[in-house]
Regions:
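Post-cleavage N-terminal segment of exported redox proteins
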Residues: 2-70, 76, 115-188, 297-314
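Surface-exposed patches in mature extracellular/periplasmic domains of secreted proteins
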Residues: 78-85, 141-146, 166-170, 250-257, ...
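Amphipathic alpha-helical interaction segments
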Residues: 88, 92, 148, 152-155, ...
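C-terminal cap of thioredoxin/glutaredoxin-like
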Residues: 189, 196, 200-201, 206-208, ...
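Sequence/structural segment immediately N-terminal to covalent heme-attachment motifs in c-type
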Residues: 61-97, 181-217, 235
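Extracytoplasmic electron-transfer domains, predominantly the class I c-type cytochrome c fold
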Residues: 63-68, 72, 100-143, 153, ...
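Detector for the c-type heme attachment site
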Residues: 91-100, 158, 201-208, 221, ...
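A cross-kingdom marker for long, charged
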Residues: 273-314
Length: 314
């Protein structure tokens, strides 16, 4: 039995299954992805860091926990099913199993906590940060502190960060800064970018693509995607991620304006309710989404986003 493959492998396989000729045409027209050294240089000015290869995972009890953490990253609905409420996996936002610079890599996150977070206005441990990912990005519920799921993810993150000094400035942490758009992000322009660059993998209605019930390309909106409380619910965060990582394997092929526009388009669609629901869209926006980068509680194409009632119990 083989474990779930990496996103790149899945992407190549799925493109062959779904649209081989279209994929070939797209690849022929697309600019080549920059080499990894250039990608790293583009996402920070600190020291370069390369996490250890999978072959270096120790063959002992600790190594087993590291491998479980890796597997949770790659197929979260399978290996952490009790805490997941959608079809996303951690690797959808932390590419290359949490290794990729400029894609919020786990090795950079691990050495950055404990840290104060404005999102919940308190100092968070690394485990608490992971809990938030399950609650918002996975639209599920937080695994208990000390649970096997969190211990496995923490072990994997620790192992990836071996050799990286704590709190040292390092290239590739988080998502790269993105220049402010020359024009205000726009739904219509974003839709054009989506149809030209994203629809092949993520489908016409953002529902993603599946093979034998398994997610191959993640849903970007709708009931199976992240909820309104997730970091990607800020189109500024989404734009930074998209610019550095999408289309998959073609980092930095979009212009900054295109990244802003398509992020706006993505976030201008409905998705599961913010679990911090305050009883009304207006109250929830006032407390948690009072930002020009959140479309929650605003009207887009005549639809009040977030007006879907209370969140479903988890």
């Amino acid at each position: 039995m083989t474990r779930k493959q990496t996103p790149m492998t899945l992407a190549l396989c799925a493109l062959g299954l779904f649209a081989a000729s279209a994929a070939s045409a797209l690849a022929a027209d697309a600019p080549m992805a920059p080499p990894k050294s250039e990608i790293n240089a583009a996402v920070g000015t600190g020291a370069q860091f390369t996490p250890p290869p999978e072959s270096a995972i120790p063959d002992d009890d600790f190594g087993k926990m590291v491998k479980l953490g890796r597997d949770i990253m790659l197929d979260t609905p399978k290996y952490a099913k009790d805490f997941v409420g959608n079809t996303l996996s951690c690797v959808n936002c932390h590419t290359d199993a949490g290794r990729m610079a400029g894609s919020a890599p786990l090795w950079a996150a691990y050495v950055s906590y404990p840290a104060y977070r404005g999102k919940n206005k308190k100092v968070n441990t690394f485990e608490e940060r992971l809990q938030g990912c399950f609650k918002f990005s996975q639209n599920g519920k937080a695994p208990p502190l000390g649970s096997k799921t969190l211990v496995a993810l923490e072990s994997y993150s620790y192992w990836l960060s071996k050799g990286l000094p704590v709190d040292e400035k390092v290239a590739g942490r988080g998502y790269p800064n993105l220049p402010e758009p020359q024009q205000a992000p726009d739904y219509v322009r974003g839709q054009k970018v989506y149809e030209a660059k994203c629809i092949l993998c993520h489908a016409a209605n953002g529902e993603g693509q599946y093979v034998n019930g398994e997610t191959v390309f993640p849903p970007l909106w709708g009931p199976k995607s992240f909820n309104w409380g997730a970091g990607m619910g800020s189109y500024k965060n989404a734009a930074k991620f998209i610019y550095a990582n999408m289309p998959y394997g073609m980092s930095y092929s979009l212009s900054p304006q295109e990244a802003w526009d398509v992020a706006y388009f993505m976030d201008a669609h409905e998705r599961p309710q913010d679990p911090r629901w305050q009883g009304s869209v207006a109250a929830t926006r006032a407390k948690f989404h009072d930002s020009k980068f959140s479309l929650y509680g605003t009207k887009v194409n005549g639809k009040l986003l977030g007006d879907i009632g209370a969140p479903k119990p988890r």
